[in-house]
Amino acid sequence: MVEVRYLGHSAVLLTDGKTRIVIDPFLTGNPMAALGVGEVQADLILVTHAHGDHFGDSVALSKKGGVVVSTFEIATYAEKHGAKSVPMNLGGTYRFEGGWLKWVPAWHSSSFPDGTYGGMPMGVVVELGGKRIYHAGDTALFSDMRLIGEMGLDLALLPIGDHFTMGPEDALKALELLRPKKVVPIHYNTFPPIRQDGEAFAQRAREKGVEGHALKPGEVLRLD
């Protein structure tokens, strides 16, 4: 069994009871954050791209014992600021106790708030506790999502905010390519430009045969 806790915006915490993985830990300064940095402990800290609302508290969490896993550029930046890191890139697979993760493409941009280049933006597929979870990061719809879907996804975490990423209509089209068993919308309602109705998206996903869950920050979805 794997627990998926939505922390707000694009931040999620995954655990199988042994390994704890946080993705895009934007907590400090996040008006929707369910937990603060002091309440989150992670073994692996996955960062899909360098924008501040995704890199977030990666360094602070690493200093508590976690390892930042991301692009070469982001990992190097994190190390310079005192984090432990594993530099990777698109297509690479990292194995850990109880599972693995693989970086896949995303269509977006990636730079730190100070303008430092963050490498290519990415999505990630995580296998943990026998479940496969796709976190799309920030992305537009793209046809190669079909290849990601061939990995056999138990859950897809998809941005629906529009403006900076795909919106609900494109995210629904993404479901046709990805064919996950379940979907959770992310990256919406944090700021005015990305206001969306998560429950309406989840309902439309269910109409397409995908189990949709619009989690509130702090809520947990269990994958049995």
UniProtKB/Swiss-Prot annotation:
In the UniProt record, does the keyword Cell cycle occur? Answer: no
Q: Does the keyword Phosphoprotein apply?
A: no
Q: What InterPro entries does this protein's entry cite?
A: Metallo-B-lactamas, RibonucZ/Hydroxyglut_hydro, UPF0173, UPF0173_UPF0282_UlaG_hydrolase
Task: Report the Pfam families cross-referenced here.
Answer: Lactamase_B_2
UniProt keyword annotations, A-Z: Hydrolase
- What molecular function does GO assign, one term? hydrolase activity
Q: Which family does it belong to?
A: Belongs to the UPF0173 family.
Instruction: Name the NCBIfam families for this protein.
Output: PRK00685.1 (NF001911)
PANTHER family assigned: UPF0173 METAL-DEPENDENT HYDROLASE MJ1163, UPF0173 METAL-DEPENDENT HYDROLASE MJ1163-RELATED
* Designated name of the protein: UPF0173 metal-dependent hydrolase TTHA1283
